[in-house]
């Protein structure tokens, strides 16, 4: 039995690092089991699992660097505005989700950082957008990654700028082994804790680099919900007031 205390999970770097340092060697585990806590006011005391395959989405974290030409805000015609380019790129990427992704697939694209400029009256030299693409469909993932790059370059070219796209990290969908998952769900049902309830066929829109472990050995992954049923449970995961 090996206990894996995974580091760097939030930046999707921990699993690969631990594999490189031999977590799956000497001896090689027969199977892997992972549990992730989740805050959910309406689902406290549940465990979610999926014996049918995909439990969590893939994730591709990207960084888009836009290069323009700095100038005084009073003379925009003398520069190339990277913020303007970034705004158009952000809107266009959302259109990819609403118009090119199959509505039956789980697919989200989020820009979580948009950094540019140092003063209110200066058009800066560059702007940086960072975000994530998540989906449960392999072909959708491949198509959107290709289209993202195409859209970014064409928009930058339209407004006379240039763009660089860096893939910061990539993680596949987390696939659960059906037999192992059903076996563990049965064990959970026998614990005998009052109010503990299993939710089968669950799919989380979040992502987890434990998926890289799941690519190599049979794996089951469960989400355990905890928290409070009163107003303390109103705050979601990653909120500074989450309890």
Locate predicted features.
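Histidine/acidic-residue-rich, glycine-tolerant segments that coordinate divalent metal ions
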Residues: 1-124, 207-210, 233
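Metal-dependent amide/peptide-bond hydrolase catalytic core
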Residues: 84-243
